Amino acid sequence: IAFAQRHNILIVQDAAYATLIYGRARLSILSRPGGKEAAIELHSMSKSYNMTGWRLGFVAGSARVVSAVAEVKDNVDSGQFKAIQMAACAGIADRKSSEKIRAHYQRRLRGLVKVLKGAGFQAKMPGGTFYLYVPAPKGAAGGLAFANAEDASQYLIKEHCISTVPWDDAGAYL
C-alpha cells in the first residue's frame, strides 16, 4: 500500500473468491490503513454465490475509484438483467448462504486431498478458492515415465478416465 501511494499506483485486487477462505479469517486490502485509497477489489458472484454464468460482479474501493469504474461501465454496456441484480443482492445480504457454499467447497476439497494423499499425491488443503493443484506424477506403474504434466494428464484420462487440467508453466502440476 505504501509503495502504491508513493508511486501513485492503483492496486487492483482480484477478489473473485474472497468468501472461499479456509482456516483463517478473510482479510481485505481495503481494511488495511490506506487501502481504500490505494486499491480496488473486483468481486464475482460466480462461485461464492453459485451464480456461475450469470456474469455479475461488483467493485469495492474509494468513492473516487468506484465512480470512475461506474462511468466507464455506463459507456461500455447496458448492464445486467434486473432480476439477476436482485438475486445477487439477496445473496450478499444472506451471509449464511455464502457460508454454506464456502463450507461445501471446503468439505469437497478436504475429501479430495484425503483421496489424493492416499493415492500417493502430494496434496494439501489450499488456503482459499476451490481449485486444487498437486505436483504431477513423474510416472506410473510398469516404468512408464511422464515428461511433463500434459503427459500425466493424458495418461490419466486415456487409461483411467480421470480428467485433470495440466499446468506446466511453473512446474508440472495437475
Regions found by a protein language model. Name each.
Residues 1-174:
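PLP-dependent class I/II
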